[in-house]
Amino acid sequence: MRLPFFAVSFFSMTSTLAQQTLVLGTATPGGGFPVYGAAFSEAINAQQPKLRVETRNTKGSTENVPLLEAGRIDLGLVAGELASAALSKPGTPLRIVTAMYASPGMFIVKGDSPYRSISDLEGRPVVLGTQGSGITVLGHAIVDTLGVPVGKITLEKAADGPPLLESGKAAAVFGAGVGWPAFTALAKNGGRFIGPSAAEIKAILARNPGLQPVTLPANSYPGQGAALQSVGSWSYVLCNKSFSEENSYLLAKAIHLSQSTLAGKLEQARETTMANTVAAAPRPDLIHPGVLKYLREAGLISR
């Protein structure tokens, strides 16, 4: 039976009205968060018709945290140490929707560069990231802990980093994670990675309890044939605790069911799983109640 036009229009309208639009704060163009946010939103939107995730460029983690706390965005991507610090504050209103990926911090130099270690960069101009980025915080933690004074270059947007290295205005660019756009661009042009030594990793971890040993797998970037050891921490998709339990449940379910789709869109998103969320959360109560409900139903945590 064919429905009258007005009936079809009514059902279409009610379906649209029922769909919840969620704003996801990412970071400045050219960095890893906007790329991840695009893949994440596409996967969720394709999987869950009741939700529509829309990305918004921000200054990065340092802006996403206060925006989330104030309820001005629904979801926010927050990196490593900043996420750990925000979640550890007494009475924090922030909750975890999902773990994103672990981000090993690295420097990249030109292939013909004489620099072979972090200490070699002493006194040299080094791009550490953008003003609001969690990657920048990690870079500062590494050079400051190791007592390596560098000429710290802060960018307006992450995409400005590679040209500074290629032109010789910077000796190195700091970044983190698998599939980071600036690393990909520079590695294709013969860039070479520099990470902390075993002794340096030990020193960094002793001074920065929010960090952990993290490995950059072999072949994560062009020309990177061996795995590299470094330090880093998990990044998360966070929300406010006042975020709808129904919507967080739907998000968790969509993330779980679209796991292979998300991994196919972005290599580092292979780590975006509900199982990793359980493992990476500092405490179970920091996971949003709606997500916990789905985790119980999926058998990922005990009831």
Q: Where are these predicted regions, by residue range?
A:
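An extracytoplasmic/periplasmic, membrane-proximal ligand-sensing/linker region
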Residues: 160, 167-168, 177-180, 184-193, ...
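Pocket-lining segment of extracytoplasmic ligand-binding domains
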Residues: 80-83, 89-90, 113, 149-243
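N-terminal signal peptide c-region/cleavage motif recognized by signal peptidases
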Residues: 13-15
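Bacterial N-terminal signal peptides that target proteins for export
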Residues: 1-6
